[in-house]
């Protein structure tokens, strides 16, 4: 059986999903479900509690079909994937980003997991380790870490690709293109609270 990715919605044009040279317009894909929240431990002040449950009204589609739909309807080649928690569906997510990259998209991924946790999973998780590796062959920017309302920096009118996209200062922005070069040591990360803005040229 082909893998299925449970999504909640797709926002074709968002100006609050990260930077792009096209006036910060990006397509935003909302992934359904968050195991952490479902177990009673959501991020403090989570933006999207309606996405915690991965069963009610979930739209399950093959990753290739979702990518084809995005390629057909997106206004440009910039996409952001949020949740819920996207990495709770890492196998179909890895397929989705592979297809999105095939269609030429720049990809930002938000997750409450830290990059260090993900790097450990690539080795320690016998079932999904290869899926984590495959994921990072295609994602361009990772924003990691739990949202913390006490460190909120989000301002949907900021217009800088950072404060109108990232929730709290503790989250880290990683340029993970080094993974595609086979050299994870080249990954650069900066804490969102230490940045003035986020731009893609």
What are these regions (language model features)?
Residues 2-61:
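Canonical Radical SAM [4Fe-4S] cluster-binding loop centered on the CxxxCxxC motif
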Residues 13-15, 66-68, 128-130:
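A generic local structural motif
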Residues 38, 88-91:
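Residues that form or flank phosphate/diphosphate-binding pockets in enzymes
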Residues 47-61, 75-89, 103-128, 132-150, ...:
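Core AdoMet radical
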Residues 65-68, 91-102, 134:
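Alpha-helical scaffolding segments of alpha/beta enzyme cores, especially the outer helices
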Residues 69-74:
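Glycine-rich phosphate/diphosphate-binding loops that line cofactor/substrate pockets in enzymes
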Residues 172-201:
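Charged phosphate-binding loop/patch that engages nucleotide di/tri-phosphates or the phosphate backbone
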């Amino acid at each position: 059986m082909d893998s299925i990715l449970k999504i909640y919605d797709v926002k074709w044009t968002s100006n609050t999903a990260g930077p792009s040279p096209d006036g910060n317009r990006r397509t935003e894909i909302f992934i359904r479900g968050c195991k952490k929240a479902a177990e009673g431990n959501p991020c403090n002040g989570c933006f999207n509690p309606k996405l915690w449950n991965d069963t009610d009204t979930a739209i399950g589609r093959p990753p290739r079909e979702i990518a084809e739909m995005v390629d057909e309807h997106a206004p440009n080649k910039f996409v952001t994937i949020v949740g819920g928690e996207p990495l709770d569906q890492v196998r179909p997510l890895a397929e989705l980003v592979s297809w999105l990259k095939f269609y030429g998209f720049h990809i930002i991924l938000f997750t409450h997991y830290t990059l260090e946790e993900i790097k450990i999973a690539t080795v320690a998780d016998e079932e999904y380790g290869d899926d984590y590796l495959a994921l990072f062959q295609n994602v361009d920017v990772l924003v990691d870490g739990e949202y913390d309302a006490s460190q909120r920096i989000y301002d949907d009118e900021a217009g800088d690709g950072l404060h109108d996209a990232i929730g709290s200062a503790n989250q880290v922005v990683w340029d993970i293109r080094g993974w595609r070069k086979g050299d994870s040591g080249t990954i650069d990360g900066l804490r969102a609270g230490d940045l003035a803005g986020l731009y893609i040229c």
